[in-house]
Every structure is written in structure tokens, then in C-alpha cells.
Curated annotation (Swiss-Prot):
GO biological process assignments: modified amino acid biosynthetic process
Organism of provenance: Archaeoglobus fulgidus (strain ATCC 49558 / DSM 4304 / JCM 9628 / NBRC 100126 / VC-16)
Name of the featured protein: Uncharacterized protein AF_2307
Pfam families in UniProt: GCS2
Lineage, top ranks: Archaea, Methanobacteriati, Methanobacteriota, Archaeoglobi, Archaeoglobales
MF (Gene Ontology): glutamate-cysteine ligase activity
Length: 365
């Protein structure tokens, strides 16, 4: 089973972000709702009203079903958007914080609690778009094994998926989203734990970590946030879904690229992986954030080799996209390579190209 969640920004013809997710959801659902079914996908709200979520109405059995259904969902969503455009990436390259609007309908008390604790008027809240992947587990043993394997893979997954090199019209890190994400809850560091989770030996141990977060939130009067989703590490356990949720990836330029990341992760999780100390993982995550795949290529090539060895026939078909990203650079790296001069005009031109990639399901080269 495969459970993807995609986040895309809503834009006008000049790629100014437009905060109208509530209007789109009202058009689809008949009233202002948190989410609404559109064909075989579900369209949902996010904290920021210029971002909209796409997820399947039910988990997928195969990668081909994933690609076909979610691309169909993108096209159906575009058909009800009155000419507005969708854009992937981990951050909107032109968004100004003063122009961002926060969801002000149902669930707003959750966002109000976050704002009271952390001041959400920052890029780490209002300008991040991720591709999240839910990996199911059938037993506690499998959940613990998957959690610990994904923990070791997080820096490498982040490197291949890094796709947020521009913020407010200027170049930053290759994965600028990750930089802001890591500090957006610094007042309660237990929540994010520098993205790398602790190695666990049981789900009881995981629940103990989660309860520690809850205790700190209760001390601050934020009872409404004491839910399993508040944990912001790069992988978390979703007991309500019986799955692990990977949160470290930037949204990509098209559905095919998201499917390729999924194929890579599913295959490599079948391999034996070497345990690494937390300080080494943080160092590698810092490298992924700053320069994408550039300084991690030997390890990434070895992981790609292992993933191919453990991949099924369908997964292997998508490995060429991952190979391209490892050898030629992540989406964020490619963007910087193709933009020797960063100007508003060049960024708009880039956004036009990336928006077409999403519409046509084409990988950006």
C-alpha cells in the first residue's frame, strides 16, 4: 500500500501566489470544507491559503496506479481553478511573508495555538511545501525496523528530494525549506529534534518520546496540539493510520518525480542498512540542506545500487529518474545550474516551465 500526500502552490499568470484554497474547496465541495473529494483524489487545505493538498481517496496498490491517479487529480484540479496555475517545489520562490494568508475556517484554533507558541509569520510555517509518504506496517516489529531504517536514510532522501533553492527571489540553500522547517518550533525543541529521530527499540519507547512532547505542550497550555501529528521529526509513527509518515522531502516538479522517490524508498527499505550515530546523520543532513546531492554522491550511488537489487520490476522503471537526480543533481541543484543569474524575470520563466512539468507530468532536466 502507498499513501502519498502532495502540496502545490496556487498562482496567477505571473506566478504570484494566490490565497484562494478555501474558494477552490468551496467550489468543489459546495461549501467551505477542510477537504473535498474530486474524482479519485481528495483535495485538502493547508495552513497557508496559497497551498493546496492532493492525496488519494484510498491508498494505492501499485506505483502505476499512483502515477495515473494523481496525475488525473492534478488535471481535474486545474480544470476547476479558473485559469490559476499549480506549482511544485519545496518553497514558493517569490512569496513575501506579508502576502501570505492563514487558513481561517475550521481547525483555525490549532493554527492559533501554533501562532501563540511560535509566531507562524515566518517562512518555516507559511512557505513550505512537502511531499509526504505514508509507509504501512503490520506489526510492532515491522514498525520499529522501518522507523530505524528510515531514520538512517533521512539525509539521503532529503538530498535527492532537495527542491527549494530560492526564497523571496534570492538563492539560499538547495533545501531552504529544510533550513526553515528545522527552526520553526525552536521554542519547544523536543518537537522537531533537529529532524533526526531517536533510534527506538519498541513502540512503547516511541510513545514515551511523544508523551514528553505532550507534557511540554501542556505546560504551555497548548492542549489542542497534543496529537500524534505534532511530532515534526523527519519520520513519525501515525498510529491512527498504522503507518510511518516520511516528512523530510520537498515537493517535486511533477507526479512522476514523486513516484520515483517512492520507488527508491520502498526498494531500499528491503535492504540491510548500516546504523549511523546521530551526530553523523545530522552532519549529512546539513550537507543535504546546503548542497543537495553534491557531497553525498558516493553514498547515494551505493544506495541506488542496493535499491535496484531489491526493487521489483515496476520500481526499477522509475529508478532512472532517481539516477538522474543523483548523478546530475537534485531538482534544486538543477534549478541553480540552469539559472546563472537570478532575477524576477528568470524566476517567473522558471516557474512557467515547472508549472508545465506538473501539468504534463514531465521531469525537469
Amino acid at each position: 500500500m502507498i499513501g502519498p500526500e502532495h502540496e502545490f502552490s496556487i498562482n496567477d499568470e505571473n506566478f504570484n501566489p494566490v490565497p484562494i484554497s478555501d474558494e477552490i474547496l468551496k467550489k468543489i465541495g459546495g461549501r467551505t470544507v477542510n477537504e473535498a473529494k474530486l474524482g479519485r483524489v481528495v483535495i485538502g487545505k493547508e495552513l497557508q491559503k496559497h497551498v493546496i493538498e492532493l492525496k488519494p481517496a484510498r491508498p494505492f496498490e501499485s506505483l502505476s496506479e499512483f502515477e495515473e491517479t494523481m496525475q488525473e487529480g492534478v488535471e481535474e484540479l486545474l480544470s476547476v481553478m479558473d485559469g490559476y496555475k499549480l506549482l511544485g517545489l519545496g518553497m514558493h520562490p517569490l512569496l513575501r511573508l506579508e502576502d501570505a494568508k492563514v487558513w481561517n475556517h475550521r481547525d483555525r484554533r490549532i493554527y492559533q495555538a501554533y501562532d501563540r507558541l511560535f509566531n507562524i509569520k515566518q517562512h518555516g510555517w507559511l512557505n513550505i511545501q512537502s511531499y509526504q509518504l505514508n509507509i504501512p506496517f503490520s506489526s510492532e516489529k515491522e514498525a520499529v525496523e522501518l522507523h530505524n531504517k528510515i531514520r538512517v536514510l533521512l539525509p539521503y532522501i532529503a538530498a535527492v528530494a532537495s527542491a527549494s533553492p530560492i526564497c523571496e527571489g534570492k538563492s539560499y540553500y538547495v533545501d531552504t525549506r529544510l533550513y526553515f522547517y528545522r527552526i520553526n518550533q525552536k521554542e519547544v525543541p523536543e518537537i522537531c529534534n533537529d529532524v533526526i529521530p531517536e533510534r527506538i527499540s519498541s513502540l512503547k519507547e516511541y510513545r514515551s518520546i511523544l508523551n514528553g512532547i505532550y507534557e511540554e505542550l501542556r505546560r504551555k497550555g497548548a492542549y489542542v496540539l497534543c496529537r500524534e501529528w505534532v511530532n515534526s521529526r523527519g519520520v513519525i509513527v501515525r498510529f491512527s493510520r498504522k503507518c510511518l509518515e516520511i516528512k523530510v522531502m520537498d515537493e517535486q516538479e511533477c507526479i512522476k518525480s514523486d513516484v520515483a522517490l517512492t520507488a527508491f524508498i520502498r526498494a531500499i527499505l528491503r535492504a540491510e542498512l548500516e546504523e549511523l550515530p546521530v551526530d553523523v546523520l545530522i552532519e549529512k543532513l546539513n550537507s543535504a540542506m546546503r548542497s543537495g546531492t553534491e557531497k553525498l554522491k558516493p553514498e547515494l550511488k551505493e544506495l541506488l545500487k542496493k535499491s535496484k537489487e531489491h526493487a521489483d520490476e515496476e520500481e526499477r522503471r522509475y529508478m532512472k529518474v532517481v539516477k538522474l537526480r543523483i548523478e546530475e543533481g537534485s531538482l534544486g541543484e538543477r534549478i541553480l545550474m540552469n539559472m546563472p543569474e537570478i532575477s524576477r524575470e528568470e524566476i517567473i520563466s522558471l516557474c512557467e516551465e515547472l508549472s508545465r512539468c506538473l501539468e504534463r507530468n514531465e521531469v525537469y532536466l
